[in-house]
């Protein structure tokens, strides 16, 4: 019998994966990737229209209208999260994996962030991740096992201009490490994207966009990352290939944390080859000129 790689067609066949923030960006890309590998996907988010669009895309791609279900949910609301997880279980019969992708933030220096603004970001990122994880664990994974992947950011040297997001993502990192112990053998991991060319970059104000256009010079890989590269890391951590990996944060950042001032990055004019497999991804307009360089 010929050897069959773990990275094979139908890798997630028979499994059900819940993806929060599944209506756009990395969540949308991850949902497509999982569906292409045989999973049924539960798309969770606040905006029904976005979820319905992704549901149609997946149905067209797979030829099966039942591959993806949609569930409108505000992950910050405890009772709503409980009901949503129960609804996914009723529709799918199981939840084998959870991708806590949903979140959000806005650029602002710490001195200008109001208490309301701080709470909004912490609830969106940290509280939502906790509530969704707890409910999936309590309602199914405690008895049947599974894997959870959380969303971080490049938080290790601070996040000037987004301190509320850095604090909440730091909380998610500690939650990931703690849950990996308390909830074992359920596997709990996280991904930490660095500078990613996501369509969400276009929503920021012009001063922040200007800094975004310059920051690629700090990346040893010579370019921004892609949504596909983040979703590929998420899928890996959900897969049997990562069966002995738990409590870790996988950085997807082109070696930015290791760039040293004593060894300046000259880049010799070259870029690392990108994996940009998601054909429906929207490249941010703010980076069009940068990509052409």
Locate the predicted segments by residue.
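Short C-terminal tail/terminal secondary-structure segment
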Residues: 2-7, 235, 246-293
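Conserved glycine-rich cofactor-binding loop
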Residues: 16, 23-25
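C-terminal substrate-recognition "lid" of short-chain dehydrogenase/reductases
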Residues: 93, 130, 223-252, 257
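Short, small/polar-rich loop/turn modules that mediate ligand/substrate recognition or access, typified
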Residues: 99, 184-187, 245-247
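Substrate-binding pocket helix/loop in short-chain dehydrogenase/reductase
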Residues: 109-110, 114-122, 215
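Alpha-helical segment proximal to the catalytic Tyr-Lys
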Residues: 138, 181-184, 243
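Catalytic loop of short-chain dehydrogenase/reductase
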Residues: 149-171, 176-177, 181-184, 195-196, ...
């Amino acid at each position: 019998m010929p050897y069959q790689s773990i990275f094979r067609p139908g890798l997630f066949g028979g499994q059900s994966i819940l993806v929060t923030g599944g209506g756009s960006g990395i969540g949308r890309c991850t949902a497509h990737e999982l569906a292409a590998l045989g999973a049924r996907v539960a798309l969770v988010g606040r905006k029904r229209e976005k979820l319905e669009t992704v549901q149609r895309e997946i149905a067209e791609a797979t030829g099966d209208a039942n591959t993806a279900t949609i569930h409108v949910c505000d992950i910050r609301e405890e009772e709503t999260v409980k009901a949503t997880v129960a609804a996914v279980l009723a529709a799918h019969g199981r939840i084998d994996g959870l991708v806590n992708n949903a979140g959000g933030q806005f650029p602002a220096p710490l001195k200008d962030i109001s208490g309301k603004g701080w709470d909004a970001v912490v609830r969106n990122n940290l509280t939502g991740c906790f509530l969704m994880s707890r409910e999936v664990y309590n309602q199914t994974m405690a008895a049947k096992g599974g894997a959870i992947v959380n969303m971080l950011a490049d938080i290790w040297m601070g996040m000037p201009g987004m301190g509320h997001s850095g604090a909440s993502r730091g909380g998610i990192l500690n939650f990931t490490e703690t849950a990996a112990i308390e909830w074992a053998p359920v596997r709990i991991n996280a991904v930490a994207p660095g500078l990613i060319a996501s369509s969400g970059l276009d929503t920021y104000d012009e001063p922040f966009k200007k800094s975004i256009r310059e920051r690629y010079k700090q990346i040893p890989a010579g370019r921004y990352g892609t949504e596909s590269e983040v979703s590929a890391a998420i899928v890996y951590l959900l897969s049997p290939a990562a069966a002995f990996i738990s409590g870790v944060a996988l950085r997807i950042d082109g070696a930015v944390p290791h760039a040293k001032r004593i060894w300046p990055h000259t880049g010799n004019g070259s870029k690392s080859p990108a994996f940009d497999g998601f054909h429906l991804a929207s490249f941010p307009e703010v980076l069009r000129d940068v990509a052409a360089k």
